[in-house]
């Protein structure tokens, strides 16, 4: 299913280099808002900074792909020293192809980490890569996202009804 989650993690810090290695994933495309940090925040939680460093030490390639504007994405990504794409138009998968080529990995070696089913999970499914969904880090500040969250509820329920677990 394009929208129902495949994998769900409590937050990004529960995605480990060991888990990625078991799945042969060498590169991650990362969303920002409610994935790495709270919605619209420029502050990175300490535990997420440590997680990013652990991923780098493990050789995992990282790129930010966000639907946000350049003025939102660029300062955040540059502070972290990460490559980035802004206004990526997820769920359309085109930016994922750009990110894959920049990271110089095969499609089967990458996954997308995000919090929204109708943007992140659908983009991953359309591109043919795993979507690693995380529980949102905080409340949604945009009316459009609040509306999408209501639509997402049935897909989250499908995941758990099928025996899906939060990792």
Language model: regions and residue ranges:
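Asp-based, Mg2+/Mn2+-dependent phosphohydrolase catalytic module
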Residues: 1-30, 37, 41-42, 47-112, ...
């Amino acid at each position: 299913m394009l929208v129902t989650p495949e994998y769900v993690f409590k937050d990004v810090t529960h995605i480990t280099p060991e888990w990625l290695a078991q799945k042969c994933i060498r590169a991650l495309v990362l969303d920002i808002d409610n994935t790495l940090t709270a919605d619209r925040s420029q502050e990175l939680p300490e535990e997420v900074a440590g997680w990013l460093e652990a991923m780098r030490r493990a050789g995992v390639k990282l790129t930010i792909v966000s639907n946000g504007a350049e003025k939102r994405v660029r300062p955040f990504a540059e502070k972290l020293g990460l490559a980035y794409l802004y206004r990526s138009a997820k769920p359309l998968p085109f930016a994922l192809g750009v990110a894959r080529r920049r990271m110089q990995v095969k499609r089967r070696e990458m996954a997308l980490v995000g919090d929204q089913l109708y943007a992140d999970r659908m983009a991953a499914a359309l591109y043919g890569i795993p979507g690693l969904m995380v529980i949102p880090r905080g409340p949604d500040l945009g009316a459009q996202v609040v509306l999408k969250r209501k639509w997402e509820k049935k897909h989250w329920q499908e995941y758990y009804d099928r025996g899906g677990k939060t990792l």
